[in-house]
A protein has these predicted regions:
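Short, well-ordered amphipathic alpha-helical segments that serve as non-catalytic structural scaffolds
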Residues: 26-42, 65-69, 94-97, 157-164, ...
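Condensing-enzyme catalytic core mediating Claisen C-C bond formation in acyl metabolism
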Residues: 1-25, 139, 224-290, 294, ...
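Active-site pocket-lining segment
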Residues: 159-162, 195-198, 206, 276-345
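N-terminal extracellular/periplasmic Venus flytrap/periplasmic-binding protein-like
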Residues: 11-12, 23-27, 31-32, 40, ...
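Active-site-proximal alpha-helical scaffold in enzymes
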Residues: 86-116, 165-194, 255-262, 327, ...
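Conserved beta-ketoacyl condensing-enzyme motif
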Residues: 23-89, 93-110, 114-133, 199-214, ...
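Conserved catalytic cysteine-centered active-site region
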Residues: 55-109, 152-156, 222-248, 329-356, ...
């Protein structure tokens, strides 16, 4: 079987809700990181066969946001683009589809990733098309409706996190401690400049100047266990899930060149990792946070590899309760999981997160000379995705 490489995995820094990245659309963020991938790899845009980009909150963004981003990045008009919406798994699914395309000989060089501007998700007037004859109309927040609500069970993703906490016995204290550790690890990584090689500057024009945005701004350096313990339950009376032990609402983008080994050699590209395989699975929507357990187990069985052989995991921290339950069910040491913090600290721009955690994973594997890593996410509506990668430099 063909070897498929990951070349120049890069991301923007993650922006906080309605903060620094808010003036930019998802496609502008996507264009920024795609341009950087091409510049770093020194690959001619005309050599790209196709593009897959995740984007979840598409209301009002116009047709095919992936193509918009590609054209803004200077990709030739004859290169086709596909926008992927697999909720939180979109960015990683986009990379998986790029991998599939190469194995199916539908291309040899594919640009893939994800982008999201949660700050720019619009409000909707659902019944305005036919007019309001009497009474008040309701504004619907598309961010909540399309990004954070289970359409099967008709409740917030936070309730699925409460369901997991109850079923798997994850206490409020455990969740707050996990969230605190996520912040500490992210702060340490930021201070040690461990994210520098994976982050590309986003240039933002203001009335007075042009700002270069290069640091994750969702990380809270002043978080304490005491502050976390004082937060009220966000989704359920007497619940355990709070704003402090859940992921953020964020903006950002990430992308990577997915390339056949032959083309890497032909164009002198430098792979950082090889994709060994991936899995996409379905689970009960009420416990969607457990998707990574099934996805990772399926992937390991498919690849004939023991979980003990995996050196590092990036398991998206949608909520502390589900991340802890996943780790416990898999029997994985926390020392291997999200070693530089996760979405609770760094943030969760939904359509970009899959590509973001893959980018972070690959760079950390290279830094540590780790052989195998797995990136995995739970997915709203009840799914899970996981990808196994191998260090190309050892």
């Amino acid at each position: 079987m063909k070897k498929v490489a990951l070349v120049s995995p890069l991301r923007t820094a993650v922006g906080s809700f309605n903060k620094t990245l808010a003036p930019l659309s998802a496609s502008e963020l996507g264009a920024t990181v795609m341009t950087a991938c091409l510049q770093q790899s020194k690959l001619e845009p005309s050599l790209i066969d196709q593009i897959y980009l995740g984007n979840v909150l598409q209301a009002g963004n116009g047709q095919n946001p992936a193509r918009q981003a590609a054209l803004k990045a200077g990709i030739p008009i004859d290169v086709p683009e596909t926008t992927i919406n697999t909720v939180c798994g979109s960015g990683l699914h986009a990379v998986a589809l790029a991998y599939n395309s190469i194995l199916a000989e539908q291309g040899n060089i594919v640009l893939a990733g994800g982008m999201e501007s949660m700050s720019n998700a619009p409000y909707l007037l659902r019944n305005a098309r036919n007019g309001y004859k009497l009474g008040n109309g309701e504004l619907v927040d598309s961010l909540v409706a399309d990004g954070l609500t289970c359409p099967i069970n008709h409740y917030h993703m936070g309730i699925t996190a409460e369901n997991v906490a109850e079923k798997y016995g994850i206490s409020r204290l455990e969740q707050d401690e996990f969230a605190y550790q996520s912040q500490l690890k992210a702060i340490e990584a930021k201070n040690k400049k461990l994210f520098e090689e994976q982050i590309v500057p986003v240039m933002i024009k203001t009335k007075k100047e042009t700002i270069s945005f290069t640091e994750d701004e969702h990380i809270r350096g002043n978080t304490t266990q005491e502050k976390l313990s004082q937060l009220k339950p966000a989704f359920k009376e007497n619940g355990t899930v709070t704003a402090g032990n859940a992921s953020g609402i964020n903006d950002g983008a990430a992308a990577v060149l997915v390339v056949s080994e032959d083309k890497c050699k032909e164009h002198a590209l430098k792979p950082l990792a090889y994709i060994k395989g991936y899995s996409l699975v379905g689970v009960d929507p009420a416990y969607m946070g457990m998707g990574p357990v099934k996805a990772i187990s399926t992937l390991l069985k498919q690849q004939g590899i023991s979980i003990d052989a995996i050196d590092l995991f990036e398991i998206n921290e949608a909520f502390a309760s589900q991340a802890l339950a996943v780790v416990k069910e898999l029997g994985v040491s926390l020392d291997k999981v999200n070693v530089n913090g996760g979405a609770i600290a760094i943030g969760h721009p939904v359509g970009a997160s899959g590509a973001r955690i893959l980018t972070t994973l690959v760079h950390e594997m290279v830094r540590r000379s780790s052989r195998y890593g797995i990136a995995s996410l739970c997915i709203g509506t009840g799914m899970g995705i996981a990808m196994l990668v191998e260090n190309a430099l050892i």
